[in-house]
Amino acid sequence: MTAHVSDFGLVKFLSNDMIDSANQFSSLGLRGTFGYCPPEYGVGSEVSTSGDIFSFGVLLLEMFTGKRPTDDMFKESFNLHNFVKKALPEHVTQVIDLNLLNMQLNVDATPNHNHNFTRRNNILTECLISILEIGISCSVEFPQERMKVDDVIAQLSSVRKKFLEGRN
């Protein structure tokens, strides 16, 4: 069996004729999961690849910060996107999930790795900043300003290569 991840922001796909009057919401016809659903879906825009990119960006930010986009700390216009954007690049360690940093520090604390600790720590920090910047670029408000799929793949591949080279 092969697992596939797709259309994360489109958990529900509702057409107007599928919504009965007993089950109406104020966001009639809104498709997706709150927090991952791009803003344009709230005003009736069609489902698009750009919407999937938005959802992917939010998911990426969630994975690396450990914060859900629906966290109580996010109110009104302050959201996960803005939380991370405000911190970069100088305060990346203040928004990164500490569990990620602790896992890496445990690996680097072994005797064979101590001589390269500073270099590896710098590479790790650069990679984390790059990944969060990708998440920010994917989750911008306006669809035309979001990264394209090919650019996301290229940049993530570049980060992966840099991270793996830094481990040697």
Functional labels for PLM-detected ranges:
Residues 1, 5-168:
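Cytosolic eukaryotic protein kinase-like domains
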